[in-house]
Amino acid sequence: MAASRSASRISFAKIIEPLEVPDLLALQTQSFDWLIGNDIWAERVQEAIDADRNDVPITSGLEEVFEEISPIEDFSGSMSLSFRDHRFEPPKYSVEECKDKDMTYSAPLFVTAEFTNNTTGEIKSQTVFMGDFPLMTPKGTFVINGTERVVVSQLVRSPGVYFEKAIDKASDKDLFSCKVIPSRGAWLEFEIDKRDTVGVRIDRKRRQSVTVLLKALGWDEARILERFGDFPSMRVTLEKDHTSSQDDALLDIYRKLRPGEPPTRESAQTLLENLFFNPKRYDLAKVGRYKVNKKLTLEVAHDVGVLTEDDVVRTIEYIVKLHAGQDPDNYEVDDIDHFGNRRLRTVGELIQNQVRLGLARMERVVRERMTTQDVEAITPQTLINIRPVVASIKEFFGTSQLSQFMDQTNPLAGLTHKRRLSALGPGGLSRERAGFEVRDVHPSHYGRMCPIETPEGPNIGLIGSLSTFARVNPFGFVETPYRKVENGRVTGQIDYLTADEEDRHVKAQANTPLNADGTFAEDRVLVRRKGGEVEFIPPDEVDYMDVSPRQMVSVATAMIPFLEHDDANRALMGSNMQRQSVPLLRSEAPLVGTGMEARAAKDAGDVVVCAQSGVVEDLSADYITVMHDDGTRRTYRLAKFRRSNQGTCINQKPIVFEGDRVEAGQVIADGPCTDNGEMALGKNLLVAFMPWEGHNYEDAIILSQRLVQDDVLSSIHIEEHEVDARDTKLGPEEITRDIPNVAEEVLADLDERGIIRIGAEVSPGDVLVGKVTPKGETELTPEERLLRAIFGEKAREVRDTSLKVPHGESGKVIGVRVFSREDGDELPPGVNELVRVYVAQKRKITDGDKLAGRHGNKGVIAKILPVEDMPFLPDGTAVDVVLNPHGVPRRMNIGQILETHLGWVAKTGWQVDSGAEGWKERLRGIGADAAPPGTNVATPVFDGAREEEITGLLDATLPNRDGQQMIGSSGKAELYDGRTGEPYPYPVAVGYIYILKLLHLVDDKIHARSTGPYSMITQQPLGGKAQFGGQRFGEMEVWALEAYGAAYALQELLTIKSDDVVGRVKVYEAIVKGENIPEPGIPESFKVLIKEMQSLCLNVEVLSSDGVSIEMRDTDEDVFRAAEELGIDLSRREPSSVEEV
């Protein structure tokens, strides 16, 4: 157990941040709190009202949906059903029980439903059960059927009105267009063509003159000319318009929208009303109304979701003014990729939309039942069918693109997954259609979405990560905080701005020098204006200032020290690879961190945090009991060796002692990849940058045997194996120790039930759970059944279908879970018993494993050298890792070099003398002028240790036990060759780098096969490790053997080793009997080819050398003939392993 020590770091930061990093899971938790309308949300609403803020929506998500759907009326309007006051009962099972028993963590939802008979005025009220509603765990995840899932927030185009400009290639004219995009309903599009006429498209149909629409809305020509007469484009349009009255215009629109149907004035009027002015059919949503009001400077109430006549007229006015080039400051086109025009659909909204969908389906059922049931007998319960609601929620969590299997490789992976922003998914973009502009970094992303962290590959730029300080406002727009500047002085006020609000202001950066009173230290300040333009201006023109230098990057990127010295492409890889790092046997916090580690570990939720202050009363490896100051006790259970979604090991261990005083919010137990409450993804290793015999060519890595022996980079991986016993047509399967034709030693580790004991060492092919399945072709007669019942089961024929350890896997059994119908466990239909076995492996580091630093510097281990052969320092310390210096210059990730030097300084400790140099003064000012050996340091992104400070500190490091300082200001040491003891001719850069072991382990990739499964049609071996397939011998490999004239090897590869079915059986027997291998026959794929050609009516025949047609019999005949001749039982499948052979 680790000693309780505080995780303090000496920070090289020069800027004091005015704002704490916010709760990193707020994106998920606050959204879900709003959806279900719980107490936490109610408190936030009250706080916002008291402080006169409007940053919290005041109606909960479910309340909104029930209000929208109420009342449901029947077709005549004589009856109605309305919903109000939803409430949740406590969940039936805890999160842990749900994970254990494959259940969904959910709470029952109840709603008060009122049925009103409008003719008699009678009201019947009932509380109705609306299904189990999945709940979010405190960590921001959902447990669905026992697995943890995350709902990713979606980036979509906001509803509103958008103006665009295109240039006509022929005439070189500016063509303007405009779209009014609702949250749901028909699109309305306006456009001005090259002949300067203004057109309109309704619901993506054919273009018409815009004046037709205005006339249909009741405007006459005089009124149109009075409002738009100054614009030539509108006059031209009016001249070309052939309609004379409102009726003509309505009929004209109807013909375009419903071609082929007979138009009448009433139907045309209704159609237009329904398209844009009926709340049931058209909804801009609150956000759409907000955007329309803002763009067109209207004052329409926020709850008006339909279009108004004013909206249409102002939109036409805007587009013709754009075309005429009037007032360009106030009339401008929109940029669709701007973050003011893209919004987030967070978890709450995504689930709310599903509930809305389910309720809409339910509404149809209710209406039908109202008409079919007897009015007297109707109660709310008889009308409501909750199936569609439950089904749509279930469908969303089970199959939606945005409900994802949680990435639990390490805590950072989980945290990042919850903060992910995706432009994909239903209603979003698709990979194929997304162009370059959507994916590119935009100036409005600053402080909202990280410009660095995004996947490499087809999803680049479509999936991002929320920036550290960003938050989401009630409309779904991402806001970022700024410090208010008034009259050239920074105030204590902090404002959260959306991207379009920010565009109206001038912002200074966080590292702008300030005086003690908050005024700017320099007479010119570097600022950012609209569109990311940069300039120097006087301090009194500045409106805002960034709150922190790490404001623009995400959590993972903010954990890369010296990020400012890395090329962005490599920083991207560094951010992504931190998420693939495997929890090691012993975690170790980085010597060189960024100050973000503790916060990230705490918010990720894999550490145990004390809820109230008190004293540790009792603790063991499994629990910690704290006696709180108010006299109450609380026991915190710790997770021991649990399997994560990715097969890594989740294990928590206490970091406090009995009797220790603990405060609320203090970390009392470490989880995976945490050390003393700090994120610890890798190990601090001594690295030398030098080529070594060509073994570290092209990013290969050389390691010391010490890392293998001392388990420095060893990790535990847990695999889950499962088997179920079902009812079959021939009788039930049985889990038993009594397996036919199996030697007793194979069953030695099975208990009396036939299940492996905990602690057993298992290797490929070992039986984990014994199971037999009845075999035979006939159903049993009642007489036979009776005989069986009397004389026992022994007589019947069964086959062995036991659960065995798959190929390439081995380890120790650490857990067994048995579920059976008899014990009352819920199991799928037809399953009587289910057994799960957990097998743990300790994987030492080995050649072929992938290692990486935090700067995108990755490589595969090529050679593990004995410690005595490794290069060593003058005091005899052998280095742990040898990296190739050629990997640094062209990749431009110099951060790794600075980390190497600062890592050495932190490991050896330092003492700065009392000199008057600037860097010494600076370090004294921030209390970083001295530190003992092994001190952890923080160098925050964009505000870290400077080059001159590192150079100075290298000179000021403490001497070793021999009194020597092995590395000077150059950062290089004299290294000695471990094999000869001779010094290398040049000094070598040596220091400590934080190295991560990634999930790409060679054990999971290496694969070999002797015999195994074959493809049904071609009879060739399957491909890939998952199918236990063979190695593909492709056409280029065939050319190689042809070139060498290796005819016999080639013949074997293409026939008996692949798909010559008869030959395979013959060779198998020849090997068993020790005879010579017979001649190969005809490959199955050749027969398939001939059949394909014959199916195309090409008569292909095989002729002998003298021209006689040879008949090729079907595969089945050949095989069975051969099998009969050879006496081989072919009723079983092909052997799939050496053991079976």
From Swiss-Prot:
The keyword Transport does not apply. InterPro entries: DNA-dir_RNA_pol_bsu_ext_1_sf, DNA-dir_RNA_pol_bsu_external_1, DNA-dir_RNA_pol_su2, DNA-dir_RNAP_su2_dom, DNA-dir_RNAP_su2_hyb_sf, RNA_pol_bsu_bac, RNA_pol_bsu_CS, RNA_pol_bsu_protrusion. GO terms for molecular function: DNA binding; DNA-directed RNA polymerase activity; ribonucleoside binding. Its EC number is 2.7.7.6. The keyword Transcription applies. GO terms for biological process: DNA-templated transcription. Keywords: DNA-directed RNA polymerase, Nucleotidyltransferase, Transcription, Transferase. One of its GO terms (cellular component) is DNA-directed RNA polymerase complex. It catalyses: RNA(n) + a ribonucleoside 5'-triphosphate = RNA(n+1) + diphosphate. It comes from the Bacteria. PANTHER family: DNA-DIRECTED RNA POLYMERASE I SUBUNIT 2. The RNAP catalytic core consists of 2 alpha, 1 beta, 1 beta' and 1 omega subunit. When a sigma factor is associated with the core the holoenzyme is formed, which can initiate transcription. DNA-dependent RNA polymerase catalyzes the transcription of DNA into RNA using the four ribonucleoside triphosphates as substrates. Belongs to the RNA polymerase beta chain family. This is DNA-directed RNA polymerase subunit beta. It comes from Parafrankia sp. (strain EAN1pec). The lineage of its organism: Bacteria, Bacillati, Actinomycetota, Actinomycetes, Frankiales.
